[in-house]
Amino acid sequence: MYFDTHAHLDDERYDQDREELIARMKQEGIGPCLTVGANMDMNRMAVALAQRHEGYLYAAVGIHPHDVGELNDATMEQLRAWVRLPCVKAWGEIGLDYFYDRAPRDAQKEAFMRQLEAAREENMPVILHIRDAHGDALDLLRQRRGNLPRGVVHCYSGSWESAQEYLSLGFDI
């Protein structure tokens, strides 16, 4: 049986047939599955799906670099509450995305560090989304060397040298 480590079953394109899709996944031997949030609405849906399909679906919650405008004290409090639920297994996806540059880079860095620290405090692994920003991401992670949560850099497209550095910091690719 496969374990899908990164799905977006909360995506609106599945609104018409989400439950049928999940049933087909089970029939085809896919699962369990981690459905990954990226903003507060998606996080809410990911948690609801994981609760509805307990033992088969799990959730990851976090604020994606495109949506860092949503991150404030209230959303951080809600994210912390969610990661304490048994169905939530990771904090993410979080990181830096300079490819689309949909949010100011300084705001992305601040949100990344804030969530990284919270994940460490909550002993949650992280799912890192780093796109065209490996230099800045590695600089920020190096500053916290020895004080980082475990995690994975998903959908990796950087250099071999950057991959080796993420690995040396304790992350999986």
Regions found by a protein language model. Name each.
Residues 1-173:
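Mid-domain alpha/beta scaffold segments of enzyme catalytic cores
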